[in-house]
């Protein structure tokens, strides 16, 4: 049986890969290799298709429940963002170093949309990152947590669709790439978001998953 490069990568025998940089990735979009808005993320220098599917569905499928929860989060957070002097971005990249440009489902960033007319937000701009996960749950708990914790994002929310729970990660540790505190919120509970500039917002988990 023939051996592919992927087999060699998993076995640790492949030659070194050359990572794609954020600048190169953005140039690909400008050159029309990818369309702006395509569900492609740059993770550790590799191009990765963003998984918005339900478990058992094809990766290209956009799970309707995933889309619904993103819309609800947008509605819940919009007014609080304006009061906090923040800007809400939906499924738009952020830049975390030279080889990472993930596309969170929801990102709360400091400032206004005009502040990002010529650039994507970086680590110093980020208040809250949110991923809505079904089949991508494992990746969002591991890879995405590592990226966001390393970047020092104060809070990371993982919307767990299969179990109708909201996982809240706080106290990022850049050295370990993990958050020191994790709490799980279910129906009947509320989640507090404490932006650094204003009063907190209490989000009902029941309303989110109804």
Task: Report residues per predicted region.
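Gly/Pro/Ser/Thr-rich low-complexity, intrinsically disordered segments predominantly at protein N-termini
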Residues: 1-210
């Amino acid at each position: 049986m023939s051996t592919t490069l992927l087999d060699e990568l998993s076995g640790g025998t492949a030659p070194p890969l050359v990572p794609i940089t954020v600048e190169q990735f953005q140039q690909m979009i400008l050159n029309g290799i990818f369309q702006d808005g395509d569900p492609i993320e740059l993770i550790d220098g590799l191009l990765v298709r963003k998984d918005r599917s339900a478990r058992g569905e094809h990766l290209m499928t956009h799970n309707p429940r995933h889309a619904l929860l993103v819309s609800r989060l947008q509605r819940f957070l919009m007014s609080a963002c304006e009061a906090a002097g923040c800007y809400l971005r939906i499924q738009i990249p952020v830049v975390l170093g030279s080889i990472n440009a993930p596309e969170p489902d929801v990102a709360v960033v400091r400032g206004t949309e005009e502040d990002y007319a010529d650039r994507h937000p970086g680590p110093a701009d980020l208040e809250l990152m949110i991923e809505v996960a079904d089949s991508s749950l494992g990746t969002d708990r591991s890879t995405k947590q590592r990226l966001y914790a390393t970047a020092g994002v104060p809070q990371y929310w993982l919307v767990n669709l299969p179990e109708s729970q909201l996982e809240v990660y706080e106290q990022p540790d850049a050295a370990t790439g993990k958050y020191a505190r994790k709490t799980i919120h279910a129906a009947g509970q509320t989640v507090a978001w404490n932006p650094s500039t204003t009063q907190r917002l209490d989000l009902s988990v029941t309303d989110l998953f109804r």
